[in-house]
């Protein structure tokens, strides 16, 4: 994820809803899967931007939670013990780190747990068609909207 992608995620969210007062789940705090390293993590500017827009942010990471709990920049973030509790009653979810446990989430789980099933997939780990079939609005960084069987998805890379 490059430096501009957190702001693109915010832009994609704002095209779907006003962020003020919305509960936004951020899945993945470490800069990459397999580490607890938060340095250079795209989650940091993303969370800061969401909080600035008035969103209530909840987050989960499989191994970076202990470090996140000690950081001042996570003081206003609800740090959840599982992706399931992070998704519960959220208005949107942002995938920031491609952890295997996030990749294994069945699309129906998003629709079942979330208030509004809006997923911004910053890592391109989910199939947009499977998301649409489960009633999830899928937005991906670097994709343009297309329509499939009446469902809006983003299935084509903007760069070719």
Where would I find each of the regions flagged by the language model?
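Structural/interface elements that position substrates and couple domains in central-metabolism enzymes
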Residues: 1-160
């Amino acid at each position: 994820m490059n430096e501009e992608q957190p702001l693109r995620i915010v832009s994609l969210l704002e095209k779907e809803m006003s962020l003020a007062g919305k509960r936004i789940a951020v899945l993945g705090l470490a800069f990459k899967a397999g580490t607890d390293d938060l340095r250079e993590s795209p989650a940091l500017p993303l969370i800061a931007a969401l909080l600035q827009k008035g969103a209530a942010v909840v987050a989960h990471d499989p191994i970076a939670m202990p470090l996140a709990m000690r950081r001042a920049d996570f003081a206003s973030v609800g740090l959840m013990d599982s992706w399931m509790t992070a998704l519960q009653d959220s208005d949107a979810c942002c995938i920031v780190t491609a952890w295997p446990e996030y990749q294994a989430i069945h699309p129906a789980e998003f629709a079942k747990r979330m208030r509004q099933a809006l997923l911004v997939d910053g890592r391109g780990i989910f199939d947009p068609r499977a998301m649409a079939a489960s009633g999830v609005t899928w937005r991906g960084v670097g994709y343009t909207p297309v329509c499939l069987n009446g469902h809006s998805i983003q299935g084509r890379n903007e760069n070719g």
